[in-house]
UniProtKB/Swiss-Prot annotation:
Disulfide bond residue pairs: 106-337
Compartments in which it is found: Cytoplasm
Residues that hold [4Fe-4S] cluster according to the record: 113, 117, 120
Further comment found in the protein's record: Reaction proceeds by a ping-pong mechanism involving intermediate methylation of a conserved cysteine residue.
UniProt keyword annotations, A-Z: 4Fe-4S, Cytoplasm, Disulfide bond, Iron, Iron-sulfur, Metal-binding, Methyltransferase, rRNA processing, S-adenosyl-L-methionine, Transferase, tRNA processing
Name of this protein: Probable dual-specificity RNA methyltransferase RlmN
Organism: Synechococcus sp. (strain JA-2-3B'a(2-13)) (Cyanobacteria bacterium Yellowstone B-Prime)
Location, primary (coarse class): cytoplasm
Domain Radical SAM core: 99-332
Pfam annotation, one family: RlmN_N
EC number assigned by the record: 2.1.1.192
InterPro entries, sorted: Aldolase_TIM, Methyltransferase_A, RlmN_N, RNA_MTrfase_RlmN, rRNA_lsu_MTrfase_RlmN/Cfr, rSAM
Cofactor note text: Binds 1 [4Fe-4S] cluster. The cluster is coordinated with 3 cysteines and an exchangeable S-adenosyl-L-methionine.
Similarity comment: family membership: Belongs to the radical SAM superfamily. RlmN family.
Length: 352
């Protein structure tokens, strides 16, 4: 028997057709398999009832590449966090965020994260490895299966730095679009910033939204909060964002987590406005998403008072910088951005 693409999840329509033909089956069997994997979300080839029984039995032992759900936690607002177990025993987290018109999935790109941002729970757990293509796609299918509705938006804002797993993440973006049917303009890639990688991303002919996690308006403070920033001067990062917008025609969003008494003062807002005006001088669009901090047990930072948040917005708007305060979802389910954490592992008895 010819080698089967393993895992099946992540294989393109043409690859699955070619495999079916190599098995002595008509090409449309590969098309059927593609539909059952990406649209029906099967977990085993035994579920593909349109296949001839003999052939289904011959190939049923080959893995689709789906992860198992270890834990599911639902918040009062309907946000659901999934703890997923990978084939090698590693654990990742995925968040499904529903609204009346959208279903957004916050996907992870790595097990843990090497960036070690001082305020981030994922950064505190360290880095294990990059995720593989099927492990990223599986997160979207898991949420789609659980909610019983199509995923409309995907944000790479879960565990990990996507641009440190760039090739696989770009493969995943293309597959989300071509195989699962999610528009590229409904996909957001969030990055803290990795030298030379934003320029690389701009050359990939994608139409995704780039979200850059700034979290500070000056280099000194940013290095305190994000150790890796010492290798990527803020002025260079902003210039790379400007070049990205000019090359792709896509707006860049800037993420800014507000930490009480640390980066949320009026002087910080004015510095941030001045910084971003560098990127907007050529008429390119930019937008700031302000994220009031979600407290975690691993860090001493606090959430700012709402009046402080409103004043920060006012200062930005006075300087013609558009800003939105992001609605925090899933706080009671421990699922909001920055709260992906190892609570499950800590609940297990003994040493792991």
């Amino acid at each position: 028997m010819s080698a089967l693409p393993i895992p099946l999840l992540g294989q393109s329509l043409s690859a699955l057709k070619d495999w079916a033909v190599a098995q002595g089956q008509p090409a449309y069997r590969g098309q059927q398999l593609h539909a059952w994997i990406y649209q029906k979300g099967i977990r085993s080839l035994e579920q593909v009832t349109v296949f001839p029984r003999a052939w289904r039995e011959a190939v049923q032992s080959y893995p689709v590449g789906r992860s198992r759900i270890v834990q599911r936690t639902e918040a009062r607002d309907g946000t659901v966090k999934f703890l997923l177990g990978l084939a090698d025993g590693q654990l990742i987290e995925t968040v499904g965020i529903p609204t009346a018109k959208r279903l957004t999935v916050c996907v992870s790109s790595q097990v843990g994260c090497p960036m070690a941002c001082d305020f981030c729970a994922t950064g505190k757990m360290g880095y294990r490895r990059n995720l593989e293509l099927h492990e990223i796609l599986d997160q979207v299918l898991t949420v789609q299966e659980d909610f019983g509705r199509r995923v409309s938006h995907v944000v790479f804002m879960g565990m990990g730095e996507p641009l440190l797993n760039r090739d696989t993440v770009v493969q995943a973006i293309r597959s989300l679009n071509q195989d699962i049917g999610i528009g590229q303009r409904h996909i957001t890639l969030s990055t803290v910033g990795v030298p030379r990688q934003i320029a690389w991303l701009a050359q990939q002919d994608l139409q995704v939204t780039l979200a850059v996690s700034l979290h500070a308006p000056n280099q000194d403070l940013r290095q305190r909060l994000i150790p890796s920033a010492s290798h990527y001067p803020l002025d260079t990062l902003i210039q790379d964002c400007r070049d990205y917008m000019l090359r792709t025609g896509r707006r860049v969003s800037f993420e800014y987590t507000l930490l009480s008494g640390v980066n949320d003062l009026p002087i910080h807002a004015r510095q941030l406005a001045q910084l971003l005006q560098q990127a907007s001088r050529s008429g390119v669009q930019l937008h700031v998403n302000l994220i009031p901090y979600n407290p975690i047990s691993e860090a001493d930072y606090q959430r700012p008072h709402p009046t402080r948040v409103r004043e920060f917005v006012r200062q930005l708007e006075q300087h013609q910088v558009r800003a939105t305060v992001r609605q925090t979802r899933g706080l009671d389910g421990n699922a909001a951005c920055g709260q992906l954490r190892g609570s499950f592992l800590r609940s297990l008895p003994g040493d792991l």
